[in-house]
Amino acid sequence: MTKPPLTLYLAAPRGFCAGVDRAIKIVELALDKWGAPVYVRHEIVHNKFVVDGLRAKGAIFVEELSECPDDRPVIFSAHGVPKSVPTAAQARNLVYVDATCPLVSKVHIEAQRHADNGLQMIMIGHAGHPETVGTMGQLPEGEVLLVETPEDVATVKVRDPAKLAYVTQTTLSVDDTADVVHALQQRFPLIVGPHKEDICYATTNRQEAVKAMAPKCDAMLVVGAPNSSNSRRLVEVGARAGCQYAQLVQRATDIDWRALDGISSIGITAGASAPEVLINEVIAAFDAHYDVTQEVVETAVENVEFKVPRVLREPA
């Protein structure tokens, strides 16, 4: 039986970003240096395949520092942690390595700087996401106000409208965030923003690639985890950019082939914490069902690399 033809558009950039790559390397190098087990507070990155792979090598994932023993190293996830976490680790004399993405750390420093200058902080982010919790936890409880939507901006209660600054989560929708920033600037004309956009280069680049790809596609799949903020945003961006069917899949086994019946083109991308092996698995699944012609939609070239902490570059 002849397979139906399918044009498969592959977004570039896609998949791993520099912060995720660094965080995974940190866990692997810590296991090399100190042996198993190494404890990791929260999933190092939001991807089950990656976490399961590290668990098999001897990483133990916990949600709280209190679950870590005193005599084993602990790593903080790429999303960042409240200031209270390293303080508690120091009080227990724990060996710890902070795998917070440097671009998240930049937001932490920004929030602290604005607070030191007497400005009240507003954070644009998703409630409960570990990155939001970590950034808000850089300052005393109640000092950072959280807004998610322009509607939230209308009701937020501030101390002094003339003394405000905002930061954002790094993995948000660029367009949605622009709407929230606009609402903040309309209501609080004196609000201070970041010197450089807080939404990171990788989030922005992956969304731009999807915007370029989506209008060409009958359907689009984003390889990523349901708890990955940046992956979920890619699905939303694809739908908004005109793709009729945009769906999140963790692996090829999640593909709903019935929903794709009759398509002649598909777009494939992946969130920043999804490894290339899972993307290749999805492409192989389409190769098995269709006569595939592959086209790359490239909107940016990435060559960012972040060094791992010095403690892991030194011999044991």
Curated annotation (Swiss-Prot):
[4Fe-4S] cluster binds at C17, C101, C200. It is an enzyme of class 1 (oxidoreductase). The keyword Iron applies. (2E)-4-hydroxy-3-methylbut-2-enyl diphosphate binds at H46, H79, H129, T170, S228, S229, N230, S273. GO terms for molecular function: 4 iron, 4 sulfur cluster binding; 4-hydroxy-3-methylbut-2-enyl diphosphate reductase activity; metal ion binding. It holds the Pfam family LYTB. Pathway: Isoprenoid biosynthesis; dimethylallyl diphosphate biosynthesis; dimethylallyl diphosphate from (2E)-4-hydroxy-3-methylbutenyl diphosphate: step 1/1; Isoprenoid biosynthesis; isopentenyl diphosphate biosynthesis via DXP pathway; isopentenyl diphosphate from 1-deoxy-D-xylulose 5-phosphate: step 6/6. Dimethylallyl diphosphate binds at H46, H79, H129, S228, S229, N230, S273. One of its GO terms (biological process) is dimethylallyl diphosphate biosynthetic process. Isopentenyl diphosphate binds at H46, H79, H129, S228, S229, N230, S273. Its EC number is 1.17.7.4. InterPro entries: LytB/IspH (IPR003451). Binds 1 [4Fe-4S] cluster per subunit. It comes from the Bacteria. Keywords: 4Fe-4S, Iron, Iron-sulfur, Isoprene biosynthesis, Metal-binding, Oxidoreductase. Its cofactor is [4Fe-4S] cluster. It catalyses: isopentenyl diphosphate + 2 oxidized [2Fe-2S]-[ferredoxin] + H2O = (2E)-4-hydroxy-3-methylbut-2-enyl diphosphate + 2 reduced [2Fe-2S]-[ferredoxin] + 2 H(+); dimethylallyl diphosphate + 2 oxidized [2Fe-2S]-[ferredoxin] + H2O = (2E)-4-hydroxy-3-methylbut-2-enyl diphosphate + 2 reduced [2Fe-2S]-[ferredoxin] + 2 H(+). Catalyzes the conversion of 1-hydroxy-2-methyl-2-(E)-butenyl 4-diphosphate (HMBPP) into a mixture of isopentenyl diphosphate (IPP) and dimethylallyl diphosphate (DMAPP). Acts in the terminal step of the DOXP/MEP pathway for isoprenoid precursor biosynthesis. Belongs to the IspH family. PANTHER family: 4-HYDROXY-3-METHYLBUT-2-ENYL DIPHOSPHATE REDUCTASE (PTHR30426:SF0). This is 4-hydroxy-3-methylbut-2-enyl diphosphate reductase. It comes from Roseobacter denitrificans (strain ATCC 33942 / OCh 114).
